[in-house]
Amino acid sequence: RTPGAVDRLRAALDRWDMRGFTTYLTEEEDGDWLTGDDAAPFFALAEQRGLIASLSLMPHHLDACATLARRHPGLTILLHHHCHFGPRSATTRQDRPLAHAIASCGNVFVKLSGQGNVAGADEEYPYPDLDWLRAMMVELFPGRVVWGSDFPVSSRHTTYRQSMNAVLRHTPLTSAGREAAMGGTMARLLGLSQG
């Protein structure tokens, strides 16, 4: 997120067979970088090349991300950790309107990952206090939720199996929804064949 980002991305694309990239906005940032002049050519190139923009954002960044998603409808955006809703960001189910603008963008997907990162400090797997959050993500992003292990970082909070079971057992998905979340959707986004 420094000047010359588009040139660095172009050089990386010339060197490697990239499928996407990740960037992390800090809690202190307002999200303006996502829609600023420096980022515009960067995201335009990412859209042109079919990359997945994997973004770690906080709930207060979602309006800017919605603007980005509408400006670049061919850009797949993958948001980390349930959009960081939950006790860590001091958001509750009453903050649901923060997600509405981004949920209406069909090119935005959400990783059902990092529940230990968004949960309260005294909460433990299976994080029953986050039931509202899992339900909200499935409802607002139908067919656009994917599992992510967040491994090895998640090992501070859960085992690898627990990170899977958070989706398989504790997220209100249909059988087809679980299959999609556990690999089918990502395979489609990456252009991989299934089977």
Spans of model-derived segments:
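Active-site mouth loops of central-metabolism enzymes
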Residues: 1-3, 27-33
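Active-site groove signature of glycoside hydrolases
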Residues: 16-28
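Conserved, mostly hydrophobic/aromatic
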Residues: 21, 46, 110, 150, ...
